[in-house]
Amino acid sequence: MTDTSLQSNTALENETTHFGFTTVAKEEKVTKVAEVFHSVAAKYDIMNDLMSGGIHRLWKRFTIDCSGARPGQRILDLGGGTGDLTAKFSRIVGDQGHVVLADINNSMLNVGRDKLRDNGIVGNVHYVQANAEELPFPDDYFDVITISFCLRNVTDKDKALRSMFRVLKPGGRLLVLEFSKPVLEPLSKVYDAYSFHLLPKMGELVANDAESYRYLAESIRMHPDQETLEGMMQDAGFENTKYYNLTGGIVALHRGYKF
């Protein structure tokens, strides 16, 4: 292979990424992911309960417990969607604290805003439409950042992690809650069957959208495994990194600090 061919292939790789199992231009992924979440926003909470049997609430509770959130702190719930974590953080930080619910998708953000306001959660929560790769916040601003079931949808994950590191205060912590790789082979086989066959059918029946939930299954398989993601966090500058496998590694919570 010539140097010119190598350069051409490298340039192509730099301009493309994965949307599920499909290779697409980076700009196209942003559009396609947006379409997925515009489509599922209204049924997002219902589908989360159905898909996980409600276990997602335990995963999120563990994330809150590991956050170390305290009254008066500033917290960023990035890719916070319908606001499950924001609701909990709002109560913890109190009137002197501040929670930002940020999401790139305005449909998800609107659903989250409406849900939280309907539940009387106002005053210390602000809503920002933002791209995780280019966060519109000052340096060293947040005490805690969480990103829950969102990172796998981000086009440039390394850039997003660097952006999170920038806006986190020294001494602050990042928590990444995301689908991961099952650690037990029998569980992995059952999980594959469930993900690729039952999830799209559930999506079709409940949300009238099988394709978005097929993408969900594919995006999980393309997401970095536990060790790889921990390494990416370290490359972005995070220290004292650690991850916890939840439900046999179907989900993992990664934690890292900025010092």
From Swiss-Prot:
EC number: 2.1.1.163, 2.1.1.201
Ligand binding (S-adenosyl-L-methionine): T82, D103, N131, A132, S148
Top-level taxon of origin: Bacteria
Alphabetic keyword roster: Menaquinone biosynthesis, Methyltransferase, S-adenosyl-L-methionine, Transferase, Ubiquinone biosynthesis
Reaction equation(s) it catalyzes: a 2-demethylmenaquinol + S-adenosyl-L-methionine = a menaquinol + S-adenosyl-L-homocysteine + H(+); a 2-methoxy-6-(all-trans-polyprenyl)benzene-1,4-diol + S-adenosyl-L-methionine = a 5-methoxy-2-methyl-3-(all-trans-polyprenyl)benzene-1,4-diol + S-adenosyl-L-homocysteine + H(+)
GO terms, biological process: aerobic respiration; menaquinone biosynthetic process; methylation
PROSITE patterns per the UniProt record, alphabetical: SAM_MT_UBIE, UBIE_1, UBIE_2
Keyword S-adenosyl-L-methionine: yes
GO molecular function term, any single one: 2-methoxy-6-polyprenyl-1,4-benzoquinol methyltransferase activity
Known pathway: Quinol/quinone metabolism; menaquinone biosynthesis; menaquinol from 1,4-dihydroxy-2-naphthoate: step 2/2; Cofactor biosynthesis; ubiquinone biosynthesis
Function: Methyltransferase required for the conversion of demethylmenaquinol (DMKH2) to menaquinol (MKH2) and the conversion of 2-polyprenyl-6-methoxy-1,4-benzoquinol (DDMQH2) to 2-polyprenyl-3-methyl-6-methoxy-1,4-benzoquinol (DMQH2).
Family, similarity comment: Belongs to the class I-like SAM-binding methyltransferase superfamily. MenG/UbiE family.
Protein name per the record: Ubiquinone/menaquinone biosynthesis C-methyltransferase UbiE
